[in-house]
Amino acid sequence: RNLLVVDETSMVDVMLMQSLMKALPDRAALLIVGDIDQLPSVGPGQVLGDVISSGAVPVLRLTDVFRQAAQSRIIMSAHRINQGSIPDLGPPEAESDFYFVQADDPETAVARIIELVKTRIPKRFGLDPIRDIQVLCPMNRGDAGADQLNRDLQDLLNPAQLEVERGGRVFRAGDKVMQIENDYDKEVYNGDIGYVDDVDPDAGELKANFDGRAVTYGFGELDTLVPAYAATIHKSQGSEYPAVVIPVLTQH
């Protein structure tokens, strides 16, 4: 008997789940795994939550967290938010994995984010500002949205390289980039993170590295790539990073 395991099921919408169920053989078992406290799917429906609340299938809830220590401020803050409470935003008394940085307006927030990514986090924790630190935004638009922060961080962290501009986006050698569509021919998929190795204007090609594998894009194919110094929280679901900076503004 076959078993199909679907992870990150909170991202699955109604149409995709219907297609999956139609394709599943009658004698196959289906195990769905996910977190109902994550953002819902971009498409319609709340499949995972509805399946759990239906009472029609056995449900096992995992409550122990192994990714962080039990006393992690990330974990304690997440639990308080889930319970509808404000997390502890005060400065930590000792070494911590969660910090709150105050900013009174979007312009100040952007300046603080840039300082954190470029200087403070690399100096304090020894992390690479491009490969190890990810800015995650609630939205693309706005002064502290992913689009503008990508432009700001790209200019500061990776200026004056060979570049190509397509669709209002600039791609430079050394950039962090994200694939935003599934490409089965290139074997790169929506949400994959890579790094630009080379931009060749003569050949009209960009070469990027995804987990040690070289992928070539013609300049006409760059609409499937975006700079990824900053990304939306939706696009980052299922990923993990050594350090994350999240702007939380009233405009969000």
Regions of interest found by a model, annotated:
Residues 13, 150-252:
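Conserved nucleotide-binding/hydrolysis modules and their immediate coupling elements
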Residues 3-7, 31, 136, 178, ...:
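Structural motif
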Residues 13-14, 41, 145, 204:
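Conserved protein kinase catalytic core
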